[in-house]
């Protein structure tokens, strides 16, 4: 293993505080954390694409005197099902996995979501260390304590709030990712820029290529990851269970989740969020909440790095049905997180179906 180097640490407050470590060569620190925890066993939950990384981590954990169990799950959103979670619990039971033991979620957002849910439910809650390997998971899924699985009714409708013991973001993993994964993950970073950190937007506007550069030297990605995690950590530290403030992290997500449901989760989450931000920006402009320059700023920033800014036409009824199922809805009203300016967040409650259709048509192709 290469020597560990930490660039930044974000401390997340709350009922169970934890640290998010951002750096390179972090396997050594992951092993140290597990070895000092009092655990006898570590279960690494990972997808086939992570087999090599999991094997490397396995060897280091065994060398530190820990027993290692592998929970192999299907790639992508296919693994986030009750059936797969049940198989994981069966394996934990067969290994006599105890309350002091630790689950490690290794992989993209689907793996970290599932690992958190498996850990939250096993013995009413065992510790989980999140090791995200995609940009999306680094800035979104692995931070914040939300866990969940998908059902036929929608995405992440079954889950639990379960804060991780620690999160380790290794920027060396970025170089292994396809360009499309970097682009899609950037949508969640841009989202945090619009809701809370204008410097994120400035970086994308002044040098979009550096914001996508996977090799750390000369890349803005380490700073963008740190800034995005800082925003999310501050929010969830004040409101873990999304009773008020945490809702702002759902900017663009109401429409995005409807798109994902319609696409049977085949769309990358970040791409759906990009289109979702364009939808809510258009709705906000129509309702007089934002001006035309801010609407155009959404489009230009997203388009500059290759994110989609439109969605296919003729699908409004299906998308409307998806939006009516959103978890943020209250009293039968569809609710949206919206902006009045960069860093100034508000809510739109129960907009008319006609206004929603108009916003949809503005982004249809």
Swiss-Prot record:
Enzyme class: lyase
Residues at which NAD(+) binds: 75-80, 109-113, 133-134, 146, 155
Protein's pathway: Metabolic intermediate biosynthesis; chorismate biosynthesis; chorismate from D-erythrose 4-phosphate and phosphoenolpyruvate: step 2/7
Keyword terms, alphabetized: Amino-acid biosynthesis, Aromatic amino acid biosynthesis, Cobalt, Cytoplasm, Lyase, Metal-binding, NAD, Nucleotide-binding, Zinc
Cofactors, names only: Co(2+); Zn(2+); NAD(+)
Residues holding Zn(2+): 188, 253, 269
Gene Ontology terms, MF aspect: 3-dehydroquinate synthase activity; metal ion binding; nucleotide binding
Biological process, per Gene Ontology: amino acid biosynthetic process; aromatic amino acid family biosynthetic process; chorismate biosynthetic process
Documented EC number(s): 4.2.3.4
Cofactor note: Binds 1 divalent metal cation per subunit. Can use either Co(2+) or Zn(2+).
Catalytic activity: 7-phospho-2-dehydro-3-deoxy-D-arabino-heptonate = 3-dehydroquinate + phosphate
Locations listed in the record: Cytoplasm
Pfam families for the chain: DHQ_synthase, DHQS_C
InterPro entries documented for this protein: Dehydroquinate_synthase, DHQ_synth_AroB, DHQ_synth_fam, DHQS/DOIS_N, DHQS_C
PANTHER family per record: 3-DEHYDROQUINATE SYNTHASE, 3-DEHYDROQUINATE SYNTHASE, CHLOROPLASTIC
Record-stated family: Belongs to the sugar phosphate cyclases superfamily. Dehydroquinate synthase family.
Protein name from the UniProt record: 3-dehydroquinate synthase
Species for this entry: Corynebacterium glutamicum (strain R)
Source organism phylogeny: Bacteria, Bacillati, Actinomycetota, Actinomycetes, Mycobacteriales
Gene symbol of the encoding locus: aroB
């Amino acid at each position: 293993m290469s020597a560990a180097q930490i660039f930044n640490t974000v401390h997340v407050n709350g009922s169970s505080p934890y640290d998010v470590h951002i750096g390179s060569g972090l396997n050594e620190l992951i092993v140290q954390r597990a070895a000092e925890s009092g655990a006898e066993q570590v279960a690494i939950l990972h997808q086939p694409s992570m087999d090599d990384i999991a094997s490397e981590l396995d060897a280091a954990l065994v060398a530190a005197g820990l027993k290692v169990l592998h929970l192999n799950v299907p790639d992508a959103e296919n693994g986030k099902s009750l059936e797969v979670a049940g198989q994981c619990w069966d394996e934990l039971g067969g290994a006599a996995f105890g309350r002091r033991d630790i689950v490690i979620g290794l992989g993209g957002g689907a793996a970290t979501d599932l690992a958190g849910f498996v850990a939250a439910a096993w013995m009413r809650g065992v510790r989980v260390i999140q090791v995200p390997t995609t940009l999306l998971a680094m800035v979104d899924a692995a931070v914040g304590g939300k866990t969940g699985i998908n059902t036929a009714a929608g995405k992440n409708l079954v889950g639990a709030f379960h804060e991780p013991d620690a999160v380790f973001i290794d920027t060396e993993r970025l170089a292994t990712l396809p360009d499309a994964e970097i682009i899609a993950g950037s949508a969640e970073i841009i989202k945090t820029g619009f809701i809370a950190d204008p410097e994120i937007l400035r970086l994308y506007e002044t040098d979009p290529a550096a914001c996508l550069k996977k090799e750390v030297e000369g890349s803005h990605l380490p700073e963008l990851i740190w800034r995005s995690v800082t925003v999310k950590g501050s929010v969830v530290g004040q409101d873990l269970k999304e009773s008020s403030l945490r809702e702002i992290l759902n900017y663009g997500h109401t429409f995005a989740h409807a798109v994902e449901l319609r696409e049977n989760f085949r769309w990358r989450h970040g791409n759906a969020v990009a289109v979702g931000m364009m939808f809510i920006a258009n709705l906000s402009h129509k309702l007089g909440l934002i001006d035309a320059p801010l609407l155009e700023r959404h489009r230009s920033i997203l388009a500059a790095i290759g994110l989609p800014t439109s969605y296919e036409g003729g699908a409004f009824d299906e998308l409307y049905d998806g939006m009516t199922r959103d978890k943020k809805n209250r009293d039968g009203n569809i609710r949206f997180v919206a902006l009045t300016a960069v860093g100034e967040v508000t809510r739109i409650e129960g907009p008319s179906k006609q206004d929603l259709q108009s916003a949809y048509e503005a982004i249809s192709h």
